[in-house]
Amino acid sequence: MSILHATILTVFPEMFPGTLGHSLAGQALNKNIWSYDVINIRDFGLTKHKNIDDEAYGGGNGLIMRPDVLGSSIDHALALNPNAEMYYPSPRGRVFTQSFAKEMLKNKNLIFLCGRYEGIDERVIEEYNVKEISVGDYILSGGEIPTLTILDCLIRLLPGVLMNQNTLSSESFEEDGEFKGGLECSLYTRPEIWRGRAVPSVLLSGNHRLINEWKKEQSHMITKLRRPELLKDL
């Protein structure tokens, strides 16, 4: 049995596993560290045309995904994954962060409802206590790409996915990590000099105390310049 299982409701089932079938996530999938199933919302569509959307009450642009169609598909998903927490990628949602990812993993059974068109009927959110989740202040064509993004983040937090689990402690946004929730420092590898640009000498010194101080100073400077709001808790 896998550590994490995701049920994905979408009108484009062929989009999964997508990028999650490659690299670390793909290897973890093959090892059954995580698993998924996809439900095609259109299978629950109405009439011979499998309609899943309709015009909005009160007017407005765009079509809305129908609650009766979504309800049938969600009921099917809950029958397969009865204790799952349900998420709906939406620009109205709580912004997804590294700490939010860890919070989500308290429940290892997740359902992702991928919206399309103008969105979904509000009554679906109320009926199933769906949690809205945002990957940023911009608009995408549907919930599939945010779902892939969120799952990629969750998967790499699972035990056995990263070759060295300590890697997590030296990454950006890790509140208990090396940079205390700030941005990661600048990174360098061979060659020592490239196109006239040299690796900072402190990194070649072998003095671990000075190297650690440099990394923390770099992290603080970069965070202050690019994401100053992260410093309020540092």
Swiss-Prot record:
Q: Which residues bind S-adenosyl-L-methionine?
A: G115, V135, G136, D137, Y138, I139, L140
- What Pfam families does the annotation carry? tRNA_m1G_MT (PF01746)
The cellular location(s) given in this protein's UniProt record come to:
Cytoplasm
Q: Which InterPro entries match?
A: Alpha/beta_knot_MTases, tRNA_m1G_MeTrfase_C_sf, tRNA_m1G_MeTrfase_TrmD, tRNA_m1G_MTases_N, tRNA_MeTrfase_TRMD/TRM10
Q: Give the reactions, separated by semicolons, that this protein catalyses.
A: guanosine(37) in tRNA + S-adenosyl-L-methionine = N(1)-methylguanosine(37) in tRNA + S-adenosyl-L-homocysteine + H(+)
Q: Which SUPFAM superfamilies match?
A: alpha/beta knot (SSF75217)
Which GO terms of the molecular function aspect are on file?
A: tRNA (guanine(37)-N1)-methyltransferase activity
One of the protein's GO biological processes:
tRNA N1-guanine methylation
Highest rank taxon of the organism: Bacteria
Record-linked HAMAP family:
TrmD (MF_00605)
Task: Give the quaternary structure.
Answer: Homodimer.
**PANTHER family assigned:** TRNA (GUANINE-N(1)-)-METHYLTRANSFERASE
Name used for this protein in its record: tRNA (guanine-N(1)-)-methyltransferase
Q: What is the lineage of its organism?
A: Bacteria, Pseudomonadati, Pseudomonadota, Alphaproteobacteria, Rickettsiales
